[in-house]
Amino acid sequence: MIVDFYFDFLSPFSYLANQRLSKLAQDYGLTIRYNAIDLARVKIAIGNVGPSNRDLKVKLDYLKVDLQRWAQLYGIPLVFPANYNSRRMNIGFYYSGAEAQAAAYVNVVFNAVWGEGIAPDLESLPALVSEKLGWDRSAFEHFLSSNAATERYDEQTHAAIERKVFGVPTMFLGDEMWWGNDRLFMLESAMGRLCRQNADLSS
């Protein structure tokens, strides 16, 4: 069973969804296909050019409370970073190759940015990530500034737009789409139905 997961490291709701998806992967033997995308470009593509949540103080004040509720429910810390300049670490995702490496990178960066409140554009963050993942630091930093990395990021963002992704986190099971951390219980229900159908077919 494969779930496509679209995220941007600037999104606290993507951080929450990643935690829950990791648990679902263990429970259901789920394969997660990770896709780091440019949320700003995705929103512009559908005409969503209004102010972001962080520019709406009343809404942001509520969201901070709501996010802490979710974090407590999941048993994880949630600390707002100093900024949301996630482009570099989004691009860095495409340095990871195998599925296990991709999952490890996503977990390390999300935990740094939203678990510890480290700014995603902190100059030393790539070195920290490289050390935790056992990567060659200079090779990773070279990749971050390469045209090939930027092109891959742009291609994946365009592919998300073509698939009608309009926000993050977004998850697909087959052709069925769910948007939002609060839709994961619906995704899990669909996964359960699929498991039962497969069991019936094999019996």
Curated annotation (Swiss-Prot):
It catalyses: 2-hydroxychromene-2-carboxylate = (3E)-4-(2-hydroxyphenyl)-2-oxobut-3-enoate. It is an enzyme of class 5 (isomerase). SUPFAM superfamilies: Thioredoxin-like. Keywords: Aromatic hydrocarbons catabolism, Isomerase, Plasmid. One of its GO terms (molecular function) is glutathione peroxidase activity. Its cofactor is glutathione. Substrate binds at K43, N53, R54, Y84. The active site is at S11 (nucleophile). Glutathione binds at S11, V168, W179, G180, N181, D182. Glutathione seems to stabilize the enzyme, which loses activity rapidly in the absence of this compound. Its EC number is 5.99.1.4. GO terms for biological process: glutathione metabolic process; naphthalene catabolic process. Pathway: Aromatic compound metabolism; naphthalene degradation. The keyword Isomerase applies. Optimum pH is 10. InterPro entries: DSBA-like_thioredoxin_dom, GST_Kappa/NadH, HCCAis_GSTk, NahD-like, Thioredoxin-like_sf. Belongs to the GST superfamily. NadH family. Involved in the naphthalene catabolic pathway. Catalyzes the reversible glutathione-dependent isomerization of 2-hydroxychromene-2-carboxylate (HCCA) to trans-O-hydroxybenzylidenepyruvate (THBPA). This is 2-hydroxychromene-2-carboxylate isomerase. It comes from Pseudomonas putida. The lineage of its organism: Bacteria, Pseudomonadati, Pseudomonadota, Gammaproteobacteria, Pseudomonadales.
